[in-house]
Structures are given as structure tokens and as C-alpha cells.
């Protein structure tokens, strides 16, 4: 072991066998990440729980009694945080988690193993929530190819699709929160969202790794379909 720049003991992984360098570096990063260790102590399924916690501590998005949709929810870290914040376990709020992958049960959370791109998904979500959502959130990341420009377009495309889904299930005044990666590719997405929401901004919680271009797009004050269409019509006159 060696100490890092903060004085903490740093774990190093010996190379050997068939372990690739990329795997070695990933394992070292996990072993030395304080958020990974804290997540285990706090019972969270992923370090991502602290990203949502920090964003919510700053912007007060999740409130008791709210209805929340968590897209690409597995393994469930964000759902755990949301359920606690809105009081889902005791029936005050509701959290519906969606993913193509299976996800272990989270107290108070309704899980649906489905593709949110399915045309029937918005209606199914409304049925599970008993109405519209106050917040649609997504910590999803697109599969990467290693080609930077292609990956950026894939990521933005995924967020655009999630935003379209959100526009079908959000209540007026609702919130959309989604992971993006810093690039010029999301400029048009920001423009579109500013038509649909009163406020759109980028936020980067401390739990996001400093060397990562990861950040979150936060859109609040959803105007709703009728208001959005009226504004668009006025712009064309």
C-alpha cells in the first residue's frame, strides 16, 4: 500500500495472469474510491446514490408524497434514495423503477422490467403511478464504442429519448434529471429542453469523479404539452 496526495492509504493491484491493464486500473479505482466504501457501509447498491443525494440536497427536488420514475434503474441506488426521500415505503410517495435488466427488490419501489422505448411504456407507467410523474430521472449511459464522437452522439441520443419519454409522463411543473457527458453535442438538446422547461442547467455533484466528463442535466418547471405547443405556435406567427 502507498499513500495518496490526501494522506490516505492507497490500494494497488498487482498485475498478473490474464488481467488487462484496463481491468487493473478499474479495480484499483473501485478499491480506492471513498464513495464505494461508503455505499457499502450505508447499504446503497451503488456509489451513484450519493450523486443523487448531493443534487437533491442542493436543489430540493425530491419531496414527501411525490411520484418518481427512475429510468435504467438497476442496480437501484437512485431508487433507494428516491424511495427514502418521497416516503415510498410507507405509502406517502411512489417510485417506479424501469430497466431492461432485473433488479432486486427495493422497499417501497415498484419495478417494471421493460423497455421505456416501447410505445406502451408511458401509459403503463401512468397506470402504475396512478397518474403523472413529478420527476423523471435517468442515470443511464449508452454502450460505448471507444470512438469519442460516436459515443457522444449515442449518449445525447439516449438522453433525447429519455426526455421525450419524460414529456409524455410528467405533470406540469415536473422535473427531468439525466446523466450526460460534457461535449458540444448536447447544445441542440439544451435548446429543445428550454422550450419545454422553465429552467435548464448542468450540474456536477462532488460524487462524480473529478477526471470524468460526466455531469447531469437538470430541467425544472415542465410546461406541459399544451403550454409548449402554444409557445411554439406563437413563435411561428
Swiss-Prot record:
Entry-linked Gene3D superfamilies: Vaccinia Virus protein VP39
Keywords assigned: Cytoplasm, Methyltransferase, rRNA processing, S-adenosyl-L-methionine, Transferase
Catalytic residues in the record: 179
GO cellular component: cytoplasm
Family listed: Belongs to the class I-like SAM-binding methyltransferase superfamily. RNA methyltransferase RlmE family.
Main location, first listed in the record: cytoplasm
Name of the protein this chain belongs to: Ribosomal RNA large subunit methyltransferase E
Gene name as annotated: rlmE
Reaction(s) the record says it catalyses: uridine(2552) in 23S rRNA + S-adenosyl-L-methionine = 2'-O-methyluridine(2552) in 23S rRNA + S-adenosyl-L-homocysteine + H(+)
Membrane-spanning intervals of the chain: none
Stated role: Specifically methylates the uridine in position 2552 of 23S rRNA at the 2'-O position of the ribose in the fully assembled 50S ribosomal subunit.
Record-listed S-adenosyl-L-methionine binding positions: 76, 78, 99, 115, 139
GO molecular function, one term: rRNA (uridine-2'-O-)-methyltransferase activity
Superkingdom to which the source organism belongs: Bacteria
HAMAP family, alphabetized: RNA_methyltr_E (MF_01547)
Localisation: Cytoplasm
